[in-house]
Amino acid sequence: MTPTARLLAATLLAALAATSPAQSRKDSVVLGMVLEPAPGLDPTMASAAAIGEVVHLSVLEGLTKIAMDGTVSPLLAESWSVDPDGRVYSFKLKRGVKFHDGEAFDAGDVKFSFERAKAEGSTNKAKKSVFDNISRIETPDPHTVILVLERADGNFLFRMGEATAAILDPKSAAGTATKPIGTGPFRFEDWKKGASITLTKNPDYRNAAAVKMKKVTWRFISDPAAQVSALLAGDIDGMPRFGAPQNLPQFQADKRFTVAIGGTEGKTIVAINNKRKPFDDVRVRRAIAAAVDRKAIVDGALEGYGAPIGSHLVP
C-alpha cells in the first residue's frame, strides 16, 4: 500500500472567507489567520503553509508566479526558454530589481538560493522533488541563469512559482526566519508573537504605483467563535479559512459582508504506521477504510463544506 493510500478519513476542507464592513479603510487591511507561522518566516526552510501565506508574493518573490487558474507567468524572471529535451531552462532576469535592504538582485542570488535549497542538511520541503533534480546552475552574466536538470520535469516552471523557490539575498538569508528580506511589494515590519504580523508597503518596489495598500496586518485567531466576533465587530477585514461554517448563513444574510467559498489543499486525515501491528495487515487497513463514513464527517463537522477523498492524494 502506498503512503497516499493511507488517507482513510480524509476530507478536503473548503476555504471559507468572510469580509467585513471595516474595508472602508482603503490603504490598510487587517486579515484574520487561523495558525501563526511556525517555526519562523522562511518558506524555503520550513514546511508550514502559514509561512507562505504571509510572506510569499508579498515580501518574497520567485522567478515565476502562479495565477489563480494555474497558469505560470514571469515574476523575477523576464522571460525564459527551454531546450527540446526539457532539461535546460534559460532565464533572463528583470533588471533594476532591489531587495528591501537596497542590495541589487542578480543571477548570483538565484544561484545562491537554489544551492542553499539543495545543500546537504537543507530542510526545504521541495529539496528532493525539485532542487535535487538541478544538476548544474550557470550564471553567464548578472541577468542570466541557466538551470540544467537531471531529468525533464513538466512542472518545473510551476514549481519555480512556489514559496519553496523564493529568492533570497545571501547577505540576509540567515535571518529570514525572523526578519525576511525580499524583493516584493511589501516589507516585513513587525511580528508580535502570539498576536500579529505587520507588513508595510515597499516604496521602492518596481511597480509601486500598483500597490494600493500601505499596511497589511495578519491577526492570529484560532478560535472560530473569536473569528465570528472579530468580523462582526469590524476588528478584521477578512477571515480566510473561516472556521465556523455553521455561521455562514448569518454572514450571507448580512449585506455588509461578502462570503467567498472555494477549495484549499487542507486535509483531515487518519495517519497509520503500516509497519506496526495490526496495521501491517492490509485487511485491517481496508476494514478501517470501510468503517469510516467520510461523508458523515464532512456533513457533521464541516456543515457539508468539504469533499471526501476517494482516491490517492498527497499527504
Residue ranges and their predicted role:
Residues G32-P84, E115, I181-T183:
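N-terminal lobe/hinge region of extracytoplasmic solute-binding protein
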Residues A208-A210, G238-P315:
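Local pocket/hinge segments that shape ligand/substrate recognition
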Residues D132, T217-S229, F242-Q246:
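Short helix-initiation/N-cap motifs at beta->coil->alpha
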Residues F158-T217, D223:
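Gly/Pro-rich hinge or "lid" segments in bacterial periplasmic/extracellular proteins
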Residues A9-L16:
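Bacterial N-terminal signal peptides
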Residues K26-L35, E78, V88-S90, V110-S113, ...:
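Short, well-ordered beta-strand elements
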Residues Q23-S24, K92, A126-D169, D190:
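Surface-exposed binding/hinge segments that line
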Residues E78-T123, P140, I146, A230, ...:
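Aromatic- and charge-enriched surface segment that lines or borders ligand/interaction sites
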